[in-house]
């Protein structure tokens, strides 16, 4: 090639190269200028436009400031607000407003972002978020898109949400509110793999949350707490100052349960939150409830079991240890008003699911064992008549032991007022037991089937005061104080042995004839019953209830009684036999003199043996009394005192001629009295026993059978006492013995 041609080519190519380099430089400078001054506005407009596009113009997104830093791969947004653009929104969109003070992204993987891969991000921090959701979407979108973690996969090293708050529901009556919250997460894998990773909780390796002032409303109840603290790495969940308040009277669903609950502290430790999310199984090492106070109004219909109520929350819950410290439990809205104070309890291996309630699970209230004690327990029996209380209760299901102390039942009205309240004669009761122990208590059977099975029950120093007023009609309904009444219990009651130790029974009676009150007592009562059961597999005529009791009548006369009966016998058959030791007949005067206007002038019993056979129709048997010098006086009542009268002296003389003054007779023959009298089902079994003894004794001393039977039967009743009637007063006679024990 000629030299002139080569020189021409070199000179013509150099200007083009310069121009290309110049253009490239200008383009680079323009790109850098656009990245510095144009990228941020473009991104801001793009975000705002994308929000309008995806919501079909129903929402407006505004971003007050947006700054990018490409070298540090960071992004900052400030003053972000999302608001509805129209008065109403489509039913496929929620109705909400959101305000965010700032959003900071750092360490964004730009290359992965451009390639459409999982974008790594070092940290994402949102500050001062306020989210108000007025309503959720009423129906799903017709063409639902893929989940966001599939559209925009991310991997965040650190995620933080600071000073968040908001409201859910209508502004006038929100369903949920949050005053302030701080949430953070580490190692967040926002991808399909992260969603299915069973070791992660909501895409993250760990979460930390502190919520202050959360408030929720459910079923008309308001639920709020001072703070909720959650840390998945430490497996911890804590709640401070939890309050649940019921709806106001007249509000809420009629017949639904109402709850009033407060608890200063609750701590759940060892919580496997990831297993809860992926398996629906709540597992934890311990749960401690500090000073929980629960008052609830039971629903009109029995609620479903606990596991079914909690099924939307978890399929199964396992907690190794549950501790309750200084709890309070009360049932309101019922006249009985039961309440438990100062409740302390520890449960082990708590499990809540459908299988744990079955009898084969051998659990007590979903737990393997319970150990605890309480303070005072109160309730009202036959409200408002009998407030009852138990001072302390001690429970150990593993040892099958229950101990109750200071059991008390106290009436609120007197015997005459009780008759007026019920409309017929009724016995007023006062009771106290120093201590009651149950050994071999099958708590698992009680929890599974509501059946009671106990090896031994012991009542220490029981005291019973029975006060009656004879003014009023007789209640002709069958008495429930009878062995055969056990047949009607729905649940099984099975006590292998029942012991009463050093008990006291006192009775007082005011007849219709005088305002004086007669008294009678049994001291040092010791009784043992075997096979107290209405379980058909335990109770039969071949295996009946048997028992023995000893005591001292009026503190003087030793008595011994043996009982045999089947609690499932439809005929109510009972066999009672016993004996009374030496005693003067005058010990009966404190009861007979003021109420029957009869007294024993003299007489000494060497011993009385009796045997009774009782069923639902008859009382039969024999009484054999050995006595001497028997004399009685018929008295009258005049001038507020019991005294001898002219007609009383005549009746006394005739009676002392008729009755046998001694037995054995002078010829050595021992006379036996027969018991033949109808059973009056409207009276208790104890009244039937007493009726048989009276009839047999009267016949034994010479009263004809028919007259003795008639005298032993109850009278037909009288009109009820008027509210202005003079109150009963104790009879003050020389025969009145001192009280064997003051009522507690």
Indicate where each model-derived feature is located:
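Flexible beta-edge/linker motif
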Residues: 60-138, 145-181, 186-242, 247-298, ...
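Extended terminal
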Residues: 2-21, 562-566, 572, 579, ...
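N-terminal type II signal-anchor transmembrane helix
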Residues: 2-56, 173-182, 344
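Short, charged/polar, low-complexity loop and linker segments
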Residues: 415-417, 474-481
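Solvent-exposed beta-strand/coil patches in large extracellular/periplasmic or lumenal scaffold regions
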Residues: 145-169, 307-335, 360, 373-377, ...
């Amino acid at each position: 090639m000629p030299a002139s041609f080569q020189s021409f080519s070199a000179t013509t190519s150099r200007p083009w190269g310069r121009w290309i380099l110049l253009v490239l430089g200008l383009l680079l400078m323009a790109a850098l200028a656009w990245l510095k001054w144009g990228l941020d506005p473009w991104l801001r407009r793009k975000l705002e436009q994308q929000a309008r596009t995806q919501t079909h113009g129903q929402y407006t997104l505004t971003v007050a400031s947006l700054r990018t830093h490409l070298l540090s791969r960071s992004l900052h947004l400030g003053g972000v607000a999302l608001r509805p653009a129209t008065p109403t929104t489509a039913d496929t969109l929620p109705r909400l407003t959101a305000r965010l003070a700032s959003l900071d992204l750092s360490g964004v993987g730009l290359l992965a972002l451009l390639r459409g891969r999982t974008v790594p991000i070092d940290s994402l921090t949102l500050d001062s978020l306020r989210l108000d959701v007025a309503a959720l979407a009423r129906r799903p979108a017709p063409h639902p898109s893929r989940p966001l973690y599939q559209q925009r996969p991310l991997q965040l090293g650190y995620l933080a949400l600071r000073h968040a708050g908001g409201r859910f529901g209508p502004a006038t009556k929100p369903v949920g509110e949050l005053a302030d919250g701080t949430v953070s997460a580490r190692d967040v894998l926002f991808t399909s793999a992260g969603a299915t990773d069973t070791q992660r909780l909501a895409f993250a390796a760990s979460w930390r949350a502190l919520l202050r002032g959360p408030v929720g409303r459910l079923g008309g109840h308001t639920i709020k707490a001072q703070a909720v603290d959650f840390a998945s790495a430490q497996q911890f969940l804590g709640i401070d100052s939890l309050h649940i308040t019921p709806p106001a009277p007249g509000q809420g669903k009629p017949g639904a349960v109402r709850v009033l609950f407060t608890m200063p502290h609750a701590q759940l430790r060892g919580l496997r939150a990831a297993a809860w999310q992926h398996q629906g199984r709540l597992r934890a090492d311990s749960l401690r409830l500090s000073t929980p106070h629960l008052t609830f109004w039971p629903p009109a219909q029995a609620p479903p079991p606990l596991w079914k109520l909690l099924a939307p929350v978890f399929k199964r819950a396992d907690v190794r240890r549950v501790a309750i410290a200084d709890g309070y439990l009360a049932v309101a809205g019922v006249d009985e008003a039961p309440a438990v104070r100062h409740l302390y309890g520890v449960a082990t291996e708590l499990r809540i699911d459908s299988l744990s309630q079955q009898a084969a699970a051998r659990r007590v209230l979903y737990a393997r064992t319970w150990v605890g004690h309480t303070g005072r327990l109160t309730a009202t029996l036959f409200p408002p008549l009998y407030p009852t209380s138990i001072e302390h209760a001690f429970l150990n299901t593993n040892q099958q032991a229950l101990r109750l102390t200071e059991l008390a039942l106290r009436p609120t009205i007197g015997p005459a007022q009780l008759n007026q309240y019920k409309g017929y004669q009724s016995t007023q009761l006062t009771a106290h037991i120093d201590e009651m122990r149950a050994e071999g208590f099958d708590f698992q059977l009680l929890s599974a089937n509501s059946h009671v099975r106990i090896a031994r029950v012991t009542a220490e120093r029981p005291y019973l005061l029975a006060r009656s007023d004879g003014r009023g009609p007789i209640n002709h309904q069958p008495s429930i104080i009878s062995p055969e009444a056990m047949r009607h219990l729905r649940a099984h009651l099975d006590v292998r042995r029942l012991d009463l130790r050093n008990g006291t029974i006192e009775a007082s009676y005011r007849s219709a004839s005088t305002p004086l009150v007669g008294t009678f007592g049994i001291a040092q009562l010791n009784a043992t019953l075997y096979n107290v059961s209405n379980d058909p597999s335990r109770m039969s005529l071949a295996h009946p209830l048997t028992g023995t009791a000893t005591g001292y009548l009026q503190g003087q006369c030793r008595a011994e009684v043996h009982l045999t009966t089947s609690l499932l016998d439809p005929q109510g058959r009972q066999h009672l036999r016993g004996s009374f030791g030496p005693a003067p007949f005058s010990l009966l005067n404190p009861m007979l003199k003021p109420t029957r206007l009869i007294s024993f002038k003299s007489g000494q019993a060497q011993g009385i043996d009796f045997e009774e056979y009782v069923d639902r129709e008859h009382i039969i048997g024999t009484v054999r009394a050995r006595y001497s010098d028997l004399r009685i006086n018929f008295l009258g009542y005049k001038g507020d005192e019991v005294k001898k009268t002219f007609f009383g002296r005549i009746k006394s003389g005739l009676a002392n001629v008729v009755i046998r003054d001694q037995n054995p007779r002078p010829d050595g023959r021992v006379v036996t009295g027969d018991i033949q009298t109808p059973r009056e089902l409207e009276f208790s079994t104890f009244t039937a026993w007493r009726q048989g003894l009276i009839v047999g004794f009267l016949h034994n001393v010479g009263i004809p059978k028919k007259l003795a039977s008639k005298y032993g039967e109850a009278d037909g009743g009288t009109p009820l006492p008027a509210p202005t009637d003079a109150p009963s007063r104790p009879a003050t006679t020389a025969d009145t013995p001192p009280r064997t024990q003051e009522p507690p």
